[in-house]
Swiss-Prot record:
PROSITE patterns: RIBOSOMAL_L36
UniProt entry keywords in alphabetical sequence: Chloroplast, Plastid, Ribonucleoprotein, Ribosomal protein
Localization in the cell: Plastid, Chloroplast
Keyword Repressor tagged: no
Keyword match Ribosomal protein: yes
Name this polypeptide is given: Large ribosomal subunit protein bL36c
Gene Ontology biological-process annotations: translation
Main location: plastid
UniProt record similarity statement: Belongs to the bacterial ribosomal protein bL36 family.
A GO term from the CC aspect: chloroplast
InterPro entries per the UniProt record, alphabetical: Ribosomal_bL36, Ribosomal_bL36_sp
Amino acid sequence: MKLRASVRKICSKCRLIRRGKRLYVFCVNARHKQKQG
């Protein structure tokens, strides 16, 4: 899980999910996981 100032989709299978005030990117590729906030 990478903590970033700006998260974005890296590939077509990445999904942006908002949980509360946090923004996550989840993907079938575990390297693409990101968190903001």
